[in-house]
C-alpha cells in the first residue's frame, strides 16, 4: 500500500496554523488524509471530518466541541483483548533489590481496576489532581468521568510474563507502518519473574502521564500507599514530558508508565528498566462532527476522501490508526 507524506502549503506548519491562517493543507483526493492535532484542538480544526482521541479526553472534547462518538478503534483493530497501549516499567536496581515491594505494588494495581468501578468521580479526580504539578488540573472532571468513560479507558493489568507475545506482535505492527516509531526489544526488556527479597525501606518515585495511565494508579494515589517503604511519591505529569523521567544519567522514576512505542525506543535493551506489565489496553475513539458511524463493514466507504485529525500522530494513536487503515486496504497520506 502506498503511504505518502505531503508538505503543507506555504508556511503552514501545524493544524493550529491551518485553522488560524486559512492556509489549507493539501487534501488527498482518494483514500484518507491524516493530520496531527493537539488534544485541545480536537473538534476545532475545520479541515478535519473526523478526529482520533483517547479516553477520558475524548469525552471531554465530545462535550466541549459538540462531537459524536463515531467508532471504536479497539473494535476496528479487531482484537478482543485490545492492544498494549501503555506499559509500566521499573528500574533494574529496584527489581533486583526489592522485588517483594514490586509484587505488592502490582497487586494493588490489579485491585485498582475493581476500585475504579465503585469509587466516586470526585474521589478519583481528587486522587489524580493532588499528584499533578501545582497549578495544573487533570484532563478530566466530574462531568465527564463517568463509570462508562472509565470502562472505555482500557485499564487492566497484564503481567509481562503473560503479555510478551501480544507486545511483540503489536511492536511489529507499528514497525510495519513506521519502522522509526519503535525500537527493538531484547529478552531482558521483559521482567517475567520477581523474587522475594525484602530490603530495608527506601524512597520510591512513581511517574505516570495524565489521562488513562494516571487512572491506572488512582487507588494507590488515593490511599497514599507506601507499602512499608520510607516513602512512595506518586507524580502525574503531562504526557509530552514522561520520557524525561526515564532518561539521563540518573533517571527520576523508579517506576514509570509510558507508551509502549516510547518504552521500546528508550528502554528496549533492558539495561536500565524492565517492563513489569501492560496497564492500558486501548482507549482510542473516532469522533465525528456529523454523527456518522464507522464500523468494519462501512469503514472504507465512510473514510474515503476524508481528513482525520489525530492526537499524537507519530505515537500509539496515529500508529494504531495506520495499522487499521492498512488492515482494511485504505490508502492514506499524512498532510500538514
What are these model-derived regions, one by one?
Residues 78, 195-200, 299-301:
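Short boundary motifs at domain starts and secondary-structure transition points
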Residues 38-130, 260-262, 291-292, 336:
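Pocket-lining segment of extracytoplasmic ligand-binding domains
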Residues 26-56, 66-72, 202-336:
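Short, glycine-/small- and polar/acidic-enriched structural segments
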Residues 63, 118, 130, 176, ...:
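Secondary-structure boundary motif
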Residues 51, 78-83, 95-102, 106, ...:
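Solvent-exposed, acidic/flexible segments
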Residues 2-29, 144-236:
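N-terminal hydrophobic or amphipathic helices and topogenic motifs
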Residues 95-177:
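Secondary-structure end/capping motifs
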Amino acid at each position: 500500500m502506498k503511504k505518502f507524506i505531503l508538505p503543507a502549503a506555504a508556511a503552514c506548519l501545524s493544524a493550529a496554523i491551518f485553522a488560524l491562517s486559512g492556509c489549507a493543507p493539501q487534501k488527498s483526493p482518494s483514500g484518507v488524509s491524516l493530520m496531527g492535532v493537539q488534544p485541545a484542538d480536537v473538534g476545532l480544526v475545520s479541515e478535519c471530518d473526523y478526529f482520533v482521541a483517547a479516553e477520558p479526553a475524548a469525552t471531554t472534547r465530545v462535550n466541549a466541541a459538540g462531537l459524536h462518538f463515531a467508532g471504536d478503534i479497539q473494535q476496528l483493530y479487531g482484537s478482543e483483548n485490545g492492544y498494549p497501549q501503555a506499559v509500566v516499567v521499573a528500574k533494574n536496581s529496584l527489581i533486583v533489590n526489592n522485588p517483594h515491594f514490586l509484587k505488592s505494588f502490582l497487586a494493588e494495581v490489579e485491585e485498582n481496576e475493581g476500585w475504579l468501578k465503585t469509587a466516586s468521580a470526585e474521589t478519583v479526580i481528587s486522587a489524580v489532581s493532588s499528584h499533578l504539578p501545582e497549578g495544573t488540573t487533570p484532563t478530566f472532571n466530574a462531568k465527564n468521568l463517568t463509570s462508562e468513560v472509565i470502562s472505555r479507558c482500557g485499564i487492566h493489568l497484564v503481567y509481562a510474563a503473560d503479555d510478551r507475545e501480544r507486545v511483540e506482535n503489536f511492536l511489529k505492527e507499528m514497525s510495519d507502518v513506521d519502522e522509526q516509531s519503535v525500537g527493538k526489544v531484547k529478552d531482558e526488556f521483559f521482567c517475567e519473574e520477581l523474587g522475594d527479597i525484602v530490603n530495608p525501606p527506601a524512597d520510591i518515585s512513581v511517574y505516570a502521564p495524565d489521562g488513562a495511565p494516571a487512572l491506572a494508579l488512582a487507588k494507590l494515589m488515593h490511599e497514599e500507599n507506601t507499602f512499608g517503604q520510607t516513602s512512595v511519591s506518586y507524580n502525574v505529569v503531562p504526557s509530552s514530558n514522561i520520557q524525561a523521567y526515564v532518561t539521563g544519567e540518573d533517571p527520576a522514576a523508579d517506576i514509570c508508565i509510558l507508551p509502549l512505542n516510547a518504552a521500546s525506543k528508550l528502554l528496549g535493551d533492558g539495561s536500565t528498566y524492565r517492563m513489569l506489565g501492560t496497564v492500558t489496553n486501548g482507549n482510542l475513539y473516532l469522533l465525528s462532527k456529523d454523527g456518522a458511524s464507522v464500523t468494519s463493514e462501512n469503514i472504507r466507504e465512510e473514510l474515503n476522501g476524508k481528513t482525520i485529525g489525530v492526537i499524537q500522530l507519530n505515537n500509539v494513536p496515529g500508529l494504531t490508526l495506520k495499522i487499521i487503515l492498512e488492515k482494511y486496504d485504505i490508502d492514506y497520506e499524512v498532510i500538514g
